[in-house]
Curated annotation (Swiss-Prot):
RuBisCO catalyzes two reactions: the carboxylation of D-ribulose 1,5-bisphosphate, the primary event in carbon dioxide fixation, as well as the oxidative fragmentation of the pentose substrate. Both reactions occur simultaneously and in competition at the same active site. This is Ribulose bisphosphate carboxylase. Its cofactor is Mg(2+). The modification N6-carboxylysine is found at K196. HAMAP family: RuBisCO_L_type2. Keywords: Calvin cycle, Carbon dioxide fixation, Lyase, Magnesium, Metal-binding, Monooxygenase, Oxidoreductase. It comes from Hydrogenovibrio marinus. Mg(2+) binds at K196, D198, E199. Disulfide bonds: none annotated. One of its GO terms (biological process) is reductive pentose-phosphate cycle.
Length: 463
């Protein structure tokens, strides 16, 4: 059934929709299935995402029609064989405020703008490319309670432009028992700032939380005494049940508090698999604790290889609305994860109060920033190029292999990361860097050959 007479109005202008502030706007890439018209399918998406049914129903009234989602712009040839561009305006009244406080929730918003429309049979691809949240909605999402300035404060740095936080993931990601896990933490903390659990590290029988966390808390205290520097740990509290997440969080904070280090703790939540409910549980139950959003599994909906799902930029915006203090953004083409240089807009959208996306100019109206967390195949040699592309180093970076694969020690690996940042910031020649960074060339010769050809001769190292 062609519903374009009701669910499309191409006379609407984006300028007026934005100025009125009564709609959430979404840009999609759409490829209709064979035998279907572009506007016909676009209108079906708007109908399926709002008030529509596959037939006319007698219960529809004038108010219902007043909250129809409307297609307001199309360009059938925008992406060639991959499909065309369409934009839909969703009335704010369609979205769901909480009973307890009137805040909007991402779960409902997501189910509406990228829910049943993903399973429609009359398209071969429907991908969300960008969306614009109006002021009246932005101000009623939780947003972050803490941000990177809170971590800089713990580290004794300026709370504005406090710089790069050198971190790692304990490797191997699974299989370490409590004692070697805590030792690995201590060894890295002698040179680096920040350690996170990897996404599957939690409460396995071979490394129970109630055994390993006390040892990690003690290792942090020893490392701080040995170095005279504050250290940070991001503990995985992900679980299916909100009470279990809270139990884990309270336990972790209690163990680190024995050394006065509860402010040195972040909570890692696997936000894709546990969903907005898990993220919000941590955000609201522990508003003083940095909320570290790990996106494991996100590629199922964000991979550029898919005609479905959403672009990573949309996922970043959803995470900020949920209240993530920091989220993994990938490595923008400099590590092992799927991505490209222009993904620096992901970081800008997270950290700035206003940012131009691919289709919409988003204002955040004072919402706290979300930190870009850079992870996945990075090491000291890859960092200068990454910083140059991004334009700053106010990020958390976790290098697992890039730290524990350093030829000298995990501590040297951590030191080399900080030296890479200092080298980029001062414009120093990497080949002439201090020892730990210089030894990274020998630690990761494959990267060195690609990024710094001729390094062997300059350092006097031969194959």
């Amino acid at each position: 059934m062609d519903q374009s007479n009701r669910y499309a109005d191409l006379t609407l202008t984006e300028e007026k929709l934005v100025a009125d502030g009564n709609h959430l706007l979404v840009a999609y890439r759409l490829k209709p299935a064979a035998g279907y018209g572009f506007l016909e399918v676009a209108a079906h998406v708007a109908a399926e995402s709002s008030t529509g049914t596959n037939v006319e129903v007698s219960t529809t009234d004038d108010f219902t029609r007043g909250v129809d989602a409307l297609v307001y712009e199309i360009d059938e040839a925008a992406f060639g064989d991959k499909g065309g561009l369409m934009k839909i305006a969703y009335p704010v009244d369609l979205f769901d405020p909480n009973l307890i406080d009137g805040h909007y929730n991402v779960s409902h918003m997501w189910s509406l703008i990228l829910g049943n429309n993903q399973g429609m049979g009359d398209h071969e691809g429907l991908r969300m490319l960008d969306f614009l949240v109006p002021e009246k909605m932005v101000k009623r999402f939780d947003g972050p309670a803490t941000d990177i300035s809170d971590l800089w404060k713990v580290l004794g740095r300026p709370e504005v432009d406090g710089g790069y936080i050198a971190g790692t993931i304990i490797k191997p990601k699974l299989g370490l028992r409590p004692e070697p896990f805590a030792k690995a933490c201590y060894d890295f903390w002698l040179g680096g700032d920040f350690i996170k659990n990897d996404e599957p590290q939690a409460n396995q029988n071979f490394c129970p939380m109630e055994v390993v966390i006390p040892k990690v808390a003690e290792a942090m205290d020893r490392a701080q005494q040995a170095t005279g520097q504050a250290k940070l740990f991001s503990a995985n509290v992900t679980a299916d049940f909100h009470e279990e997440m809270i139990k884990r969080g309270e336990y972790v904070l209690g163990e680190f508090a024995k050394y006065g280090n509860e402010k040195h703790v972040a909570f890692l939540v696997d936000g894709f698999v546990t969903g907005p409910a898990g993220v919000t549980t941590s955000r609201r139950a522990f508003p003083d604790t940095y909320l570290h959003f790990h996106r494991a599994g996100h590629g199922a909906v964000t991979s550029y290889k898919s005609p479905m799902g959403m672009d990573p930029l949309c996922y970043m915006k959803l995470a900020r609305l949920m209240g993530a203090s920091g989220i993994h953004t990938g490595t923008m083409g400099y590590g092992k994860m799927e991505g490209h240089n222009d993904e620096r807009v992901l970081a800008y959208m997270l950290e700035r109060d206003e940012c131009q996306g691919p289709y919409f100019y988003q204002k955040w109206y004072g919402m706290k920033p979300t930190t870009p967390i850079i992870s996945g195949g990075m090491d000291a040699l890859r960092l200068p190029g990454f910083f140059e592309n991004l334009g700053h180093g106010n990020v958390i970076n976790t290098c697992g292999g890039g730290s524990f694969g350093h030829i000298d020690s995990p501590a040297a690996g951590g030191i080399s990361l900080g030296q890479a940042y200092a080298c980029w910031k001062t414009g120093a020649e990497p080949i002439e860097a201090p020892r730990e960074f210089a030894r990274a060339f020998e630690s990761f010769p494959g990267d060195a050959d690609k990024i710094f050809p001729g390094w062997r001769e300059k350092l006097g190292v031969h194959k």
